[in-house]
Amino acid sequence: MSWITPDLIEILLSILKAVVILLVVVTCGAFMSFGERRLLGLFQNRYGPNRVGWGGSLQLVADMIKMFFKEDWIPKFSDRVIFTLAPMIAFTSLLLSFAIVPVSPNWVVADLNIGILFFLMMAGLAVYAVLFAGWSSNNKYSLLGAMRASAQTVSYEVFLGLSLMGVVAQAGSFNMTDIVNNQAHLWNVIPQFFGFVTFAIAGVAVCHRHPFDQPEAEQELADGYHIEYSGMKFGLFFVGEYIGIVTVSALMVTLFFGGWHGPFLPPFVWFALKTAFFMMMFILIRASLPRPRYDQVMSFGWKVCLPLTLINLLVTAAVILWQAQ
């Protein structure tokens, strides 16, 4: 058939890759909630969810059915349009953040030359969703949680971006595939160890995960900026948070641990194993660390993370200039 051209086939294959990768990310984010509950139960010497399916394997399905049939309630004096848009923006921005991550040499949704900048833009867009949710709910606890979340996210995004500049300087590109190819013989975590440490800390803070979950502190804010959400609107926030964890874990692998590079096994298997390891670390951090005060979180960011990030960037620049001579 004459209308089937090589360009059309390439477009269809690109769409297929995008759909497959994004569906896998959503599925991983959803199943991570079950894995987290089981592991936290193990660490806290209790069973965790184990009633639905073999070993609790169908607990996620039960939770989805329950959430689907929950009342989609909107507060009486809220801004209905913004209240509805907020979870959509949060979910979409976090899902699109994964689009620039190369899973294997030929599997990436969007191989952009400004890949890292695109991730930072999507992370910044998620802040608006939190602000919209807190302000439109017409609830003081929601607003306080949104203010905390926006201040924390904007602050730690500074360190998040600066911690990546050393990697960009070494690779000479913002393209994620170029950065992975630059690690064929030496992973970036060795020359950029302090950059990795600050990126990991900032990544946990941007995802609002324990111990940086002050915007959702149950003891203080009764669940923070999404206290008024129920049904599938809350589900979008809930799954979006875990998609953020998957994305940050995948970025740690891509930027600092060689991406898909590894011996014997296929590239996507290495990428999946490394990403699963860092997803597990998010759960271990939640199980083992206490929650500090909000002022301690902000003070730690500006007084510890920022100087460490700047020193790492200056040392990296000096080494690159010395090697160029």
Swiss-Prot record:
The chain crosses the membrane at residues 11-31, 50-69, 81-101, 114-134, 154-174, 186-206, 237-257, 265-285, 304-324. It catalyses: a quinone + NADH + 5 H(+)(in) = a quinol + NAD(+) + 4 H(+)(out). NDH-1 is composed of 13 different subunits. Subunits NuoA, H, J, K, L, M, N constitute the membrane sector of the complex. Belongs to the complex I subunit 1 family. It comes from Salmonella typhimurium (strain LT2 / SGSC1412 / ATCC 700720). Its main location: membrane. NDH-1 shuttles electrons from NADH, via FMN and iron-sulfur (Fe-S) centers, to quinones in the respiratory chain. The immediate electron acceptor for the enzyme in this species is believed to be ubiquinone. Couples the redox reaction to proton translocation (for every two electrons transferred, four hydrogen ions are translocated across the cytoplasmic membrane), and thus conserves the redox energy in a proton gradient. This subunit may bind ubiquinone. It is found in: Cell inner membrane. Its EC number is 7.1.1.-. Keywords: Cell inner membrane, Cell membrane, Membrane, NAD, Quinone, Translocase, Transmembrane, Transmembrane helix, Ubiquinone. Pfam families: NADHdh. It is a multi-pass membrane protein. Disulfide bonds: none annotated. The lineage of its organism: Bacteria, Pseudomonadati, Pseudomonadota, Gammaproteobacteria, Enterobacterales. One of its GO terms (molecular function) is quinone binding. GO terms for cellular component: plasma membrane; respiratory chain complex I. The gene is nuoH. PROSITE patterns: COMPLEX1_ND1_1, COMPLEX1_ND1_2. GO terms for biological process: aerobic respiration. This is NADH-quinone oxidoreductase subunit H.
